[in-house]
Amino acid sequence: MDNRPIGLLDSGFGGLSVAKKVIEKLPNESTIFIGDNAHIPYGDRTREDIINLTRRSVKFLLEKNVKLIVIACNTATAVAMPTMQKEVEQQIIGVIQSGALAAARTTKNKNVAVVATNVTVASHAYQKEIKFRDPEIKVTELAAPKLAPLVEAQKDYATNLKVVKESLAPLMGKEFDTLVLGCTHYPLIQKEFEEAINNKEVTILDPADQVAQYTFNVMRRDGLFSDSEKAVHEYYTTGNSETFDKLARTFMDDDTLTSKHVDTENY
């Protein structure tokens, strides 16, 4: 047994989509989430920037004595995770491997589309992971740099839908039956994706469920389950805590959720 918390990090709000599934899957586990909202978006930054910013959040979580870390950010998983795994003793779990596995299992016509940030698409991380599982699957990758900042800006549904439709336009007419939301921000506007795609034959895939299951499996394997009867969930942001709380309370269905501001510059 290990009663230390699970650490989760993201470039901003997006990782809440993963945190929510992890909490649902592991209700006895305490969690600490940090969103680096001050430096969003990661998807347009250099490789060096992404590694350094991810390292700061990892160090912050380690200072909080977490037992494992979930990088709840596709861009950070694609770019920084290999480096972090070399630098840190704790198990580090990313989101891309789980998303790719879910996509390979879901597609029936072996035609998958992935929408993600510029950096994630440029890394071809999803394409590599999906084809590793099934080389016959055709993977179409689409960069949508406007979408993560859109979620952070907390716009209304109509505005979101317009930008999602514009971003997905290059996919219209393609024969994919599975669309991977390759950025953890995107599930926060999944309804807009569903309306924009408007095709019941297409499965819109949020990798968070698979990430939560993999986290469960790792903890069972390594004997990391908590025997605590009451889980505690802490939220931190490098941005404005009031802005963070507004979206987080709605998405996490918790009116009492209160985050704390943290400056990771010195980590």
Curated annotation (Swiss-Prot):
What keywords appear on the UniProt entry?
A: Cell shape, Cell wall biogenesis/degradation, Isomerase, Peptidoglycan synthesis
Does the keyword field hold Transmembrane?
Answer: no
Protein's pathway: Cell wall biogenesis; peptidoglycan biosynthesis
Enzyme Commission designation: 5.1.1.3
The source organism is: Lactobacillus acidophilus (strain ATCC 700396 / NCK56 / N2 / NCFM)
Q: Please provide an example of a Pfam family that matches this protein in its UniProt record.
A: Asp_Glu_race
| NCBIfam families assigned | glut_race
- Give the family, as the similarity comment puts it: Belongs to the aspartate/glutamate racemases family.
What Gene Ontology molecular-function terms does this entry list? glutamate racemase activity
The record places the active site at C73 (proton donor/acceptor), C183 (proton donor/acceptor)
Protein name according to UniProt = Glutamate racemase
GO BP term, example: cell wall organization
Which InterPro entries did the record assign? Asp/Glu/hydantoin_racemase, Asp/Glu_race, Asp/Glu_racemase_AS_1, Asp/Glu_racemase_AS_2, Glu_race
* SUPFAM superfamilies per the UniProt record, alphabetical: Aspartate/glutamate racemase
The entry's substrate-binding residues are D10, S11, Y42, G43, N74, T75, T184, H185
Function recorded in the entry: Provides the (R)-glutamate required for cell wall biosynthesis.
